[in-house]
Amino acid sequence: MGHAMNAGTSPIANMGRLAGKQILVLNWRDIKHSQAGGAEQYMHQISARWVEAGAKVTWFTGHQPGQSAEDFLDGIRILRSGGTLGVYAQAARKLLQTGSLYDAVVDCQNGIPFFSPAFLPRRIPVVQLIHHVHQEQFRSRFSAPMAAVGRFLENTGAKAVYGQRAIAAVSPSTRLELRKLGFRGPVHVVPNGTIEVPQTVGPRDPEPTIAVVSRLVRHKRMDLLLGQLAVAARSIPRLRLEVMGDGPERARLQQLATDLGLDDTVTFHGYQPNAQRNALLSRAWVTASTSAAEGWGCSVIEAAAWGVPCMALRVPGIRDSVVEGRTGWLVDTAREFGPALVTALETMANPNKAREISAQCQQWARCFTWDRSAELLAGVVLEEELRLQGAEEAASSDMATLIRFPAPVAADLSSVVRPTDEIAENNGEVSLLMKGKDEFEAFALLKRVGVLNVQLRPAGRSMLLAGPGSAFAAEAG
């Protein structure tokens, strides 16, 4: 029997195979926590889809004053115990008492791991979910002794406890940082989803406008953006910056804007509900990022959904989210940022060029759906389960290969594709993204099942992120 395929990008259908399974998610916060952010939203969106597919998902997370000890959100059971650090000890107790009742554990690491394999039977699949590596943040935010402890736990301690257990990273940049730390097990890329791409956008503001959605915290380096905005404002009359978001840096940044003579240029809106935020984004010419590093540029992709390109520094996470020359522009140093911002705004002043770039931004954003993210992470869980059962070897490398061949497929592909692979059929052609395989390994597997008329190429960063069914990624590589 041939392998079933749907038009467009799809992982090998995985969520249905989680039906009936008890899955435990360990996270230090849930989405109702006052400091919840993108990491919590990521796992919540995926968990809700797993529940819809028939899985039974329980979160064990930290407790904040005013929160109940147990809750149900979107079909997800939430258990809360312990504070910011106490949650780790409480999670260990929970795993020792009831861990054997679960079919799989997703261990969300936010700098400090839960070390769940130490408290679970070996047979239970554990997938560590990592958004970004915190080694530099430990150095910059904590005293030397505390920073040393944090770096040890995230690096040496985690490698010792998790060993060859699977990791899901949200971007190629995060995977690269993990490899630099010496993690040698399989690291799968599972990008974030984003908002639904609107059918129509605009009209754009008649004046050159930059819209930024960001928490106002130190590592976002909004002060750098303000400094470079002062440079750009000399060349761009009536330039505007709309800042949406709040945080401990707000008062300092407002004073800096005053000191730079930008009071008439910059508006700090604070936190904005979705409707107001979207209205401001849809009118923007560009968005901007001067962050030191990210796991993934969530706000960059949200802006792209509204057809807004990004001017950014080439840093981890952001360089994955911006396709240079198509959905934005990247520079290597802060000194280059101001002049490049001027060039970007001048480009967007051309209506024809602006329409072209806006269309490419939206095409890129359409690649990132929460349904696909949920399928991909389910695939990582299933692949780890097969590995522990001895039915499948771990991915041997971080390489990925795109294979194209004519449809329909007479061969049974089920013996050669893995749960983490993706397959699509469009216009009489099958596109298969095989992960952990180079071109020679991929061809050998397909030859084994009689698929010989193939075209193979290494899959680049954009292809890996967007999936094989995306014409955008096929062109971008």
Residue ranges and their predicted role:
Residues 134, 146-167:
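Membrane-proximal helix-turn-helix segments that form the acceptor-binding/catalytic region
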Residues 137, 315-325, 329-330:
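Short acidic/histidine- and often glycine-rich active-site loop of Leloir-type glycosyltransferases
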Residues 168, 194, 201-229, 242:
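Conserved donor-binding/catalytic core segment of Leloir-type glycosyltransferases
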Residues 173, 193:
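Carbohydrate-associated surface elements
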Residues 254-272:
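Nucleotide-activated donor-binding/catalytic signature segment of Leloir-type glycosyltransferases, i.e.
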Residues 292:
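Aromatic "clamp/platform" in nucleotide-sugar-dependent glycosyltransferases that forms part
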Residues 300, 309-312:
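Short hydrophobic beta-strand element within catalytic cores of glycosyltransferases
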Residues 324-325, 329-335, 344-349:
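Conserved acidic donor-binding segment of nucleotide-sugar-dependent glycosyltransferases
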